[in-house]
Amino acid sequence: MAVISMKQLLEAGVHFGHQTRRWNPKMAKYIFTERNGIHVIDLQQTVKYADQAYDFMRDAAANDAVILFVGTKKQAADAVKEEAERSGQYFINHRWLGGTLTNWSTIQKRVARLKEIKRMEEDGTFEVLPKKEVALLNKQRARLEKFLGGIEDMPRIPDVMYVVDPHKEQIAVKEAKKLGIPVVAMVDTNTDPDDIDVIIPANDDAIRAVKLITAKMADAVIEGRQGEDSVESVEAELAATETQADSIEEIVEVVEGSNE
């Protein structure tokens, strides 16, 4: 049985490609037809390739692969973060910083700085610093978290990279290829598929389409890590964690409010 049904794909609008004038001819074999100047993706192929991508992600996770989810455009940012976290993996959902993979040692220094600022707040250092300095540190932390928060705890360069819209994320894909990291990606009709190892022909501009495919890739990771029956239990566990996190945030707000 397919991991994603034709009905699910249709409802999420996965079949809508780009305008015909914006197509990449290398995607021709994944296109079913053209309607009103828009290419329509062949969903029978999407079903098949989604199955292959699922198996690839599941098997990688079963071998303890570190997987990086990448999607920096607004339609992808939330899904990439949520599904990476749900599957216990890592993400970049804001601008890709050049050298994130190929200049890993420098990126690690920035991550170390982020952790240092967090420690300063936790150990009370902030309380003895001038307010102006604390404000600058908070600003620096916010920026570092925005770009690097999703890989703060990533133990090493990823073994696999999942990408939403490799046309937009060309720098990320090039870095992965340079390092021999396989790329799994949602590939729309305007994209060159040659640099993608595992292709999922799909509309990468619709929020529902991105969420559907990305969630299935996260399910594959969860299954690979913990077995086929574990997806629901992991979701329940994460829901409990989120509730706990919310209560902690409330406590922080109360403490901050009392210091004003």
From Swiss-Prot:
GO terms for biological process: translation. One of its GO terms (cellular component) is cytosolic small ribosomal subunit. PROSITE patterns: RIBOSOMAL_S2_1 (PS00962). Signal peptide: none annotated. GO terms for molecular function: structural constituent of ribosome. The keyword Ribosomal protein applies. Keywords: Ribonucleoprotein, Ribosomal protein. It holds the Pfam family Ribosomal_S2. It comes from the Bacteria. Gene3D superfamilies: Glucose-6-phosphate isomerase like protein, domain 1, Helix hairpin bin. InterPro entries: Ribosomal_uS2, Ribosomal_uS2_bac/mit/plastid, Ribosomal_uS2_CS, Ribosomal_uS2_flav_dom_sf. The keyword Ribonucleoprotein applies. HAMAP family: Ribosomal_uS2_B. Belongs to the universal ribosomal protein uS2 family. PANTHER family: 30S RIBOSOMAL PROTEIN S2 PROKARYOTIC AND ORGANELLAR, SMALL RIBOSOMAL SUBUNIT PROTEIN US2M. This is Small ribosomal subunit protein uS2. It comes from Streptococcus sanguinis (strain SK36). The lineage of its organism: Bacteria, Bacillati, Bacillota, Bacilli, Lactobacillales. The gene is rpsB.
